[in-house]
């Protein structure tokens, strides 16, 4: 049931050669979530995001979608921001994403670009793979990371990480750097074009405790 909140395509390009794992049998508890899960869902509801809880699933190779939701839209100060290509994402990441989108993105767009954000385009969330060059699972392997590709404003302008991080107007470049800096304050790991070539077209936002901002 979609919660109006009163009451993936691909993910980050960590390891494009990594094989996708097939799901294995899993037990679910989505109808009777643990107390901490219920608390997180309640916190997410307070953001007035629209979301649907997702059934827990375990996959081979250590991948999983546990305590996840599907976000339909996020609340700004006056309306809702649409989302594209976003699969299951952990409740914790979704809650951080909701706060960042409203206070770090939409308000920055108003102040710097003179228009509100109508849509946030993503490259997805869950994807079962490792970080490139390592055997360590990516944050996407547990649906704990989101890749942000672009922002579409209410006046139709589209500001993308790929085209506008270096090639946009002065205002667009400033906007992207402000939202990147804001993400660093909310997410444990935030990676952008200045990190490496694999992130030249998106911002990688991960809800972990790493405190790593590049």
Put a short name on every predicted segment:
Residues 9-28:
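Bacterial Sec signal peptide processing site at the extreme N-terminus
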Residues 15-21, 66, 72, 137, ...:
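Catalytic cores and adjacent binding grooves of peptidoglycan-active enzymes
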Residues 23-42:
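N-terminal low-complexity, Pro/Thr/Ser-rich intrinsically disordered segments
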Residues 25-31, 87-96, 134-135, 161-170:
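Second-shell loop/turn segments in exported
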Residues 36-120:
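Active-site acidic/histidine clusters and adjacent loop/turn architecture
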Residues 111-143:
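Active-site-adjacent substructure of cysteine-protease-like catalytic cores
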């Amino acid at each position: 049931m979609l919660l109006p909140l009163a009451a993936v395509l691909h993910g980050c390009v960590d390891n494009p050669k990594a094989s996708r794992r097939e799901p294995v049998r899993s037990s679910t508890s989505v109808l009777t979530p643990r107390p901490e899960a219920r608390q997180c869902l309640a916190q997410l509801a307070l953001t007035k995001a629209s979301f649907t809880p997702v059934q827990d699933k375990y996959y081979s190779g250590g991948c999983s979608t546990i305590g996840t939701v599907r976000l339909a839209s996020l609340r700004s100060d006056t309306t809702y921001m649409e989302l594209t290509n976003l699969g299951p994402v952990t409740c914790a990441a979704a809650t951080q994403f909701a706060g960042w989108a409203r206070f770090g993105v939409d308000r920055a767009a108003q102040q710097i670009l003179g228009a509100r954000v109508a849509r946030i385009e993503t490259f997805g969330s869950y994807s079962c793979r490792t970080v490139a060059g390592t055997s360590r699972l990516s944050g996407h392997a547990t649906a704990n990371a989101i890749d942000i590709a672009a922002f579409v404003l209410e006046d139709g302008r589209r500001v993308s990480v790929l085209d506008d991080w270096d090639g946009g107007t002065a205002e667009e470049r400033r906007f992207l750097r402000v939202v990147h800096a804001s993400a660093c304050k909310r997410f444990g790991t935030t990676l952008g074009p200045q990190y490496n070539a694999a992130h030249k077209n998106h911002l990688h936002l991960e809800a972990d405790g790493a405190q790593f901002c590049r």
